[in-house]
Amino acid sequence: METATLVTIFISGSLVSFTGYALYTAFGQPSQQLRDPFEEHGD
């Protein structure tokens, strides 16, 4: 394969992995440990 093809595949895979990890952190099991500043603020 050409170098440009390998670089493109690597960058695309990195972006997909980062997006998946971000979604897992936001909506998956670790999201229960995140603090919600809107719930902490009393009206």
From Swiss-Prot:
It holds the Pfam family PsbN. GO terms for cellular component: chloroplast thylakoid membrane. Disulfide bonds: none annotated. Keywords: Chloroplast, Membrane, Plastid, Thylakoid, Transmembrane, Transmembrane helix. It is found in: Plastid, Chloroplast thylakoid membrane. InterPro entries: PSII_PsbN. The chain crosses the membrane at residues 5-27. It is a single-pass membrane protein. GO terms for biological process: photosynthesis. May play a role in photosystem I and II biogenesis. Belongs to the PsbN family. This is Protein PsbN. It comes from Piper cenocladum. The gene is psbN.
